[in-house]
Amino acid sequence: MNFFFKLTKLFYSLIIIFFITFFLSLVLDYFFGKKILELTDNYWKKTEFYGRILRIDHPVYHHGLKENVVLKNSKGFDGLFTFCTDNHGFKNECNQIIDKDFEIGFMGDSFTEGASVKYEDSFVGLYKKASNKDVANLGVVSYSPKIYLSKINYLLSQGYTFKHIVVFIDISDLYDDSFYYSLNTNLEVGENSRRGEKLKLRRILRNNFPFTNFYMFVLKKLNTKSEEQKIKSLTPSFHDEAMKKAIWTYTDPKNINGYYGSIEDNQKSMIQIIEKLYFLLKENNIEMSLAVYPWPQQIENDIVNSKHVEMWSKFCEGRCKHFFNFFPYFFDSKEKYGYLETYKKYYWWDDIHFNKDGNKVIANELVKVLK
């Protein structure tokens, strides 16, 4: 009985010590967390975990990339690669200090950022090398039309200049724009819906307890890494979230489970946002072009004249300098070689993003047209 009492007392003492330690670490993090990360910045740059630190919040257009990053251990689908940003926080070649005047700005999400390849292998980097033009890669993971508009408006207000903006409209833009983001009258991007509430909590953690947020990410990353399977299946396996975001272009229902609002209303909302972007660019004597491209799910399940293609080709009539439609290229490949061979040639396995060959397809067309 005495032994049990002592054991119980020890247990409660350990719990109290744990919570006191945790509380003190949060207090320390609240006041000194940012400074701790700054002091250890050079160490984290040598690890794959720095990918968390280089993606930062923005008070106007929601999120972006940290300036002057040189991350040599960024994890890609075919090994590690070097991820760099310039002095503006745009993905670029390493150690670039450039001014605010650009001939062409490319806007989009992770496809445009080239999140899974080094800059030189992304379609923006390939185009820049071939054309020798002053190019800005404005794209970042998880961007969508509300952020496209907000960020470009912000950059123009900060003295950036462009002659031409090319917007790559992603398949996921309809879902992301309606489900994740809100836009106020000042063109500032906020968060929307239940998912938005989770993002708000995450942002509070990042802003107030940055070091705690970071080491939680490291622990999660290490756990995920230990669970990775190296054996490939004969057919690709996509994340449920990707399947959900892709389905709207090749299904009939006006309302899809898991979506925020009807497909038709979300299409109209996206068009209104891009129309505002068009008028903003026109007021500043900047030409606009749009580009559309398929995800693997579109190649497998959709038609070449997809809803996605139709809505944006119609929008571009009388507005866009160019309308880049990459659906025919990939559907022609499907016709010749089949879906699976087309997928393996142009996309990363078990993922929706273009591999190096897929990026070359996009870049080659840009080089032909944007001279």
What is each residue range found by the language model?
Residues 132-134, 160-165, 282-289, 319-322:
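Loop/turn elements at helix/coil->beta-strand transitions in domains of secreted/extracellular proteins
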Residues 35-130, 242-253, 330-334, 338-349:
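Membrane/wall-proximal cationic-aromatic binding patches
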Residues 12-29:
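Hydrophobic membrane-insertion alpha-helices, especially the h-region
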Residues 32-33, 345-371:
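Histidine-centered active-site loop/cap adjacent to the catalytic His
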Residues 145, 149, 267, 271, ...:
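Short, amphipathic alpha-helical "lid/cap" segments that border enzyme active or binding sites
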Residues 171-313, 326-337, 345:
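Serine-dependent acyl-ester chemistry module
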Residues 113-195:
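Conserved SGNH/GDSL esterase-like catalytic core that processes O-acyl groups on lipids
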